[in-house]
From Swiss-Prot:
This is Small ribosomal subunit protein eS4, X isoform. One of its GO terms (molecular function) is RNA binding. It comes from the Eukaryota. It holds the Pfam family KOW. InterPro entries: KOW (IPR005824), Rib_uL2_dom2 (IPR014722), Ribosomal_eS4 (IPR000876), Ribosomal_eS4_C (IPR032277), Ribosomal_eS4_central_region (IPR013845), Ribosomal_eS4_central_sf (IPR038237), Ribosomal_eS4_KOW (IPR041982), Ribosomal_eS4_N (IPR013843). The lineage of its organism: Eukaryota, Metazoa, Chordata, Craniata, Vertebrata. Keywords: Acetylation, Cytoplasm, Isopeptide bond, Nucleus, Ribonucleoprotein, Ribosomal protein, RNA-binding, rRNA-binding, Ubl conjugation. It comes from Monodelphis domestica.
Length: 263
């Protein structure tokens, strides 16, 4: 019987959003254990090699990491398979570039460049709040941070803004109708809109209705909702397309229009 952790990941079993082709090898990089789940993260090697094209091979990625050029959420990471996930800030000191991992409307991680000013903070969803030993209140975020003595107004499903230098909470957004959110799971992954209402289903999943900037409405589970702004003012810069998913016909029309303008 096999003992211990799994160390390999076959290429065909890798998450679809990594966009690895099936025929270039047998294995895929298995993400290390870390703050994000295997199916919801992007190993650092794939980000540097396949997305940014800063390296051609895994060996080159290792050389980049070992020179301590790559920071994730303000901390140097030398592990090439470190799991980078939603809302993480990747900074490359040498080139002065900063990226935030957010989903595009196709449900893949977009290469989203941000300013040095924006790279100083990140948003985290509150997964749970509890009172620990000696009656110390704690909260746990979506990226496995445990923060003690939070503001007593912060509850589950709210979003907190964390200063990456100190790890302290600087501000928070309540989970409320009328606030801007991004969908982080399910069929509507990557869509951005304003929360219109929440249906409570005791014993089952609460359903949240969201309306995007084009006026299209859709519904998803509460667990898939990540609040990113108060009202319709987002606290982070949004990726291209602003989280509005086009239908196939709209995409085609947009392509044709772009072709005619260029032609």
């Amino acid at each position: 019987m096999a003992r211990g952790p799994k160390k390999h990941l076959k290429r065909v079993a890798a998450p679809k959003h990594w966009m690895l082709d099936k025929l270039t090898g047998v294995f895929a990089p298995r993400p290390s254990t870390g703050p994000h789940k295997l199916r919801e993260c992007l190993p650092l090697i794939i980000f540097l090699r396949n997305r940014l094209k800063y390296a051609l091979t895994g060996d080159e990625v290792k050389k980049i990491c070992m020179q301590r050029f790559i920071k994730i959420d303000g901390k140097v990471r030398t592990d090439t398979t470190y799991p980078v996930g939603f809302m993480d800030v990747i900074s490359i000191e040498k080139t002065g570039e900063h990226f935030r991992l957010v989903y595009d409307t196709k449900g893949r991680f977009a290469v989203h460049r941000i300013t040095a000013e924006e790279a100083k903070y990140k948003l985290c969803k509150v997964r749970k709040t509890f009172v620990g030993t000696k009656a110390i209140p704690h909260l746990v975020t979506h990226d496995a941070r445990t923060i003690r003595y939070p503001d007593p107004l912060i509850k589950m499903n709210d979003t907190i803004q964390i200063d990456l230098e100190t790890g302290k909470i600087t501000d928070f957004i309540k989970f409320d109708t009328g606030n801007m959110c991004m969908v982080t799971g399910g069929a509507n992954l990557g869509r951005i809109g304003v929360i219109t209402n929440r249906e409570k289903h005791p014993g089952s999943f609460d359903v949240v209705h969201v309306k995007d900037a084009n006026g299209n409405s859709f519904a998803t589970r509460l667990s898939n909702i990540f609040v990113i702004g108060k009202g319709n003012k987002p606290w982070i810069s949004l990726p291209r397309g602003k989280g509005i998913r086009l239908t196939i016909a709209e995409e085609r029309d947009k392509r044709l229009a772009a072709k005619q303008n260029n032609g």
